[in-house]
Amino acid sequence: MTLKLYSFGPGANSLKPLATLYEKGLEFEQVFVDPSKFEQHSDWFKKINPRGQVPALWHDGKVVTESTVICEYLEDVFPESGNSLRPADPFKRAEMRVWTKWVDEYFCWCVSTIGWAFGIKAIAQKMSDEEFEEHINKNVPIPEQQLKWRRARNGFPQEMLDEEFRKVGVSVARLEETLSKQDYLVDTGYSLADICNFAIANGLQRPGGFFGDYVNQEKTPGLCAWLDRINARPAIKEMFEKSKREDLLKRQNEKVA
């Protein structure tokens, strides 16, 4: 049995299957795809996922894409390994999937758009105008992604950013409403609902960040306690610590090369 996860590391959508692999205690090879080098658009990676997007899971010659789908796949294939991440009760499992659907269709998108506007801009501006257009037209297969790259380079409309910040506020309020009453998003315990939402919410609480006014101990104590609770889990701590070591080793090897 061979598992390889191609990802950007422990953040955003890449964190979902990465955390799931650690929670399940599965052996796997982590393959870092470097967005600063546009590796997700490279020919070698598009042989793995023709859409040029991470994460992607390689399992004995078969490739599974889409972050939440990968998480469910790992639970389906390895139900007895490590921690169970889906409620046994069908109704509670449905509740879990309402949360994973919501994060994929709403919460992730508003946070992602703001991340693209402010975090991806420097990467998108590394090339000349001519080089950028050639790269986007030749190597980015999805029209919607082409548009996002152009907006990241040239600037997102302010009214769009205002709307996405509004949606972040709505998202944070929904999470706080639930997490002020219970430890996890589904009251039967920790599940993929938590992993998938944690992947997007973790970091929003950083003081001085874009979202510090939305997520803090005063305004969202339940959400902050939930973030602390998940960050304290042994599997999550191992994920972050091992990823830091691998990143440091990679940087050292690049300096030697």
UniProtKB/Swiss-Prot annotation:
The segment(s) forming the GST C-terminal domain are 89-257
Query: Taxonomically, which superkingdom?
Result: Bacteria
The protein's matches in InterPro entries, at most eight in alphabetical order, are given as:
Glutathione-S-Trfase_C-like, Glutathione-S-Trfase_C_sf, Glutathione_S-Trfase, Glutathione_S-Trfase_N, GST_C, Thioredoxin-like_sf
PROSITE patterns (UniProt xref) = GST_CTER, GST_NTER
Keywords attached to this Swiss-Prot or TrEMBL record, sorted alphabetically, are: Lignin degradation
Residue span, GST N-terminal domain:
1-82
Q: Name one GO biological process term.
A: lignin catabolic process
Q: What is this protein called?
A: Protein LigF
As recorded in Swiss-Prot or TrEMBL, the protein's gene is named ligF
